[in-house]
Amino acid sequence: KYTGGTMGISAVPGSGKTHTLSALAAKLVEQMMTNKTSNPFNGTEREVLIVTFSNSAVSNFSARIAKFLSEKGLVPGIGYRVRTLHGMATDIVRGRAEGYGLDPDFNILDETAANMLLRRAVEQWAADDNAATFNRYIKKDIKEEKQKGILSGKWLDDITTVAGSVISQAKDYQLSPEMIADRLKSFPGEDFSLLRMVSSIYSRYQTMLRSYPALDFADLMFYAAQILENDPVYLNILQDRWPFILEDEAQDSSLIQEKVLRLLTKRNGNWVRVGDPNQAINETFTTA
């Protein structure tokens, strides 16, 4: 009986959430068509936006919604859009890429390609700053055997892992390399030495991404949030385009992903979140 508003639904695996969300999407499309709210508004065609995590889920939702619409006598493929969260962010960023110094034809690196590029940034850092520099970042009480392993070559893998985790967190909190470097100026000497190291690697990594040009998955959400916060006209257009947002696997949404969806739904307030709180990896998902 949902017709609008914010709603959280707890759904354990096997409870039929895909079927239910697909049926709801079809109902909302029919509702918009009946009310003629799907007609162009300010040059924007209105759609129900369904966001999920995997491409396979996108295909599944698309097929089910199309089936429900056909049964209602409506044309499939009109009045809704099914995207992964990163696919949605890509749509947002491409629409305003040039205003943020990005090539509108940027490539998107998957996790494997991004990790390979990050490893190159680490190797560049090591070549520029000398491997011995890392010695300063190792705790004095570290076991001698581990220290030898780190400095004999394995340390590049360790640094890449640490840098990847920190960079991902930085982007989740919308912190650029420049912002981190600027904040570190308040802490002279050896304070936050590990963060200084990662900041240098982060800067090199972003420079490499721009040279392609390319964005990684975290960049997509980083820029999507920035654009929506700083461009109210564009945000208004997107809010007109997507008056309803249905979110699948909400328990897996990161802080910045939740922020982007909150910005998109702030005006209309029509946001349905479906997830399993028992599998939540953060605190952004709460049940109704």
Regions found by a protein language model. Give the residues of each.
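Active-site catalytic microenvironments for nucleophilic, acid-base chemistry
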Residues: 27-34, 64-71, 95-96, 120-128, ...
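ATP-hydrolysis module of ASCE/P-loop NTPase motor domains
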Residues: 76, 99-200
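Short helix/loop segment immediately N-terminal to the Walker
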Residues: 32-43, 132-148, 230, 234-241
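P-loop NTPase Walker
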Residues: 1-104, 108, 236
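Conserved helicase NTPase motor core
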Residues: 1-21, 49, 81, 110-114, ...
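Short acidic/histidine-centered micro-motifs embedded in hydrophobic/aromatic stretches
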Residues: 88, 140, 166, 223-224, ...
